[in-house]
Amino acid sequence: MNDSAHIDYARYDHIRPLLWTGDALELLDQRKLPFEVAHVRCDSSDAVAEAIHSLAVRGAPAIGIAAGWGVVLAARDIAADDGSAALQKLEPALLRLNAARPTAVNLAWALMRMRRVLGAAGADWREVIAREAQAIADEDLAANRHMGALGAALIAPGSGVLTHCNTGSLATAGFGTALGVIRAGMAQQRIAKVFAGETRPWLQGARLTVWELQQDGIDATLIADSAASHLMKSGLVQWVIVGADRICANGDTANKIGTYQLAIAARHHGVKFMVVAPSSTVDMATASGDQIEIEQRDPGELFGVGGVRTVADGIHAWNPVFDVTPGDLIDAIVTERGVIAQPDLARMQAAFGA
């Protein structure tokens, strides 16, 4: 039942947020969804960095993929006889890309892959980095489809699920992480009902997740973030399924702000909590969530909705955009390498090494 062959990908996997045209990176502008489908054309690495920072492209896997193509674009501006020489000249562009969003480990991971292959490349270094950027995207899509099947297998038929933020095709190379599990669960008739939190302040759940599910013909119910505990108490959901921007060696998980409170509420109400992310999101070099840098964005993002100010002048705001869920509140971490139940340091080391 958990075989991915049971999934109609023509129906459940047709949205693509990134397209490499051969001379530019085209990004589906997620700031304008769902009412306008527009694209941002990036002709330089700086344009890619700005698109990442401004949330034109978002989602940990997607920004890693975008950064890979950003390196390819940066390479056009330099001359070098081999990869090692090119790497020295490209380092400023790599640093600018890495600084675009600090919390998601996939960004640094993708850039490290590009550094590694570049340093070992010869005269064909331009072709080498283009192949590596494409490989990062291809591997992410394959991982997402596999994780979808693994995660769906944990869900009893007839279950209701709640998700947070956007973890679908828009956040990845395709299919999605947590939303990939939901897509697979719907395709296999394991999931009976899907709820999505609106996800203030950027409303990724309201603007993106329910739109994605609508494109697939999946009926989803939007809730206010503050309604989640009441929903769990009602008995309508058996799983909370979320993505991740960084998973630490002990299982602590950084994800969109609001995830931590969902995990606390889920544990109180006996609702299971699943984190779905590719192994590139796992950071075994970070011992615990206390060591994660949490991105703080402009407080002005909290002052209004849809460009309309709703807050009086002179009000202060605090706007962290990620929080850390302790590993002991997580029932399962699903990666393409398998399922880690009740994650802790020993189980994480067994799956990913020290």
Swiss-Prot record:
Disulfide bonds: none
Transmembrane segments: none
Catalytic-site annotation from UniProt: D245
Keywords in alphabetical order: Amino-acid biosynthesis, Isomerase, Methionine biosynthesis
Annotated metabolic or biological route of this protein: Amino-acid biosynthesis; L-methionine biosynthesis via salvage pathway; L-methionine from S-methyl-5-thio-alpha-D-ribose 1-phosphate: step 1/6
Record-level GO BP terms: L-methionine salvage from methylthioadenosine
UniProt-annotated binding residues for substrate: R58, G59, A60, R101, Q204, N255, K256
Enzyme Commission no: 5.3.1.23
Functional summary from the UniProt entry: Catalyzes the interconversion of methylthioribose-1-phosphate (MTR-1-P) into methylthioribulose-1-phosphate (MTRu-1-P).
Family label: Belongs to the eIF-2B alpha/beta/delta subunits family. MtnA subfamily.
Stated name of the protein: Methylthioribose-1-phosphate isomerase
Organism in which the protein naturally occurs: Xanthomonas euvesicatoria pv. vesicatoria (strain 85-10) (Xanthomonas campestris pv. vesicatoria)
